[in-house]
Amino acid sequence: GLNILQLCINFPCPIIFAVLTAELLSDKFKKTVQTVTFFPYFISWAAFGGIFINLLDYDTNIFNTLLYQAGILKEKVNVLGDPDYFWGIIITTSLIKGMGWGSIIYVAAIAAIPQELYEAAKIDGANRWHKIRYITLPSIAPTITLFFILSVSGILNNGIDHLLVFQNRSNISKSEVLDTFIYKYGTKDPWYRWSYTSAVGLMKSLVSLVLLISSNFICKKVTGKGIY
């Protein structure tokens, strides 16, 4: 469930972000926004996650405290310990950390679009929405298709360092996925069952290959574009 939800949210957000920054912001402000959003990507999950753990901690959560003191909450919420909040934490932090970096390729694809197309559209009376719909999105469609296929094929990869930072005994019911299972069973289990975890990893790779071929086939049928 977490894998599918991450794909549905984390895949389109960098595209939307790239299109909005390219079409709606001035060049000076655009560079500032891109720099600010790129920066979190270069921070390790240990440090980045530690910041959010301190922000969301039961005792130090400032938003929790303010809402409780204002009477909006009857009692403080243990965000890190409640399994129902775990998926939201993972998706939100992955967006903040990776959206700027994930939008780079789309920004580059938009920059490669001939400006004459936009100038001709402006002469014909096209507004910004028309330019985005009829010029920008069709022009970057091959790039979107490529990354969609790669994202679908990698849907089983959650990012183990990301999950382990926020995982605890209270949210284990929502935070335990295939990657964390392989890691724990292969390295922390007293018997070090490497052969078993290697087999699980191989099956995971085979599933990813099937997803890659299937998603490429579907994209070629629907859009006429694929990776081969």
Predicted regions: what they are:
Residues G1-Y228:
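A structural signal for multi-pass alpha-helical bundles of membrane permease subunits
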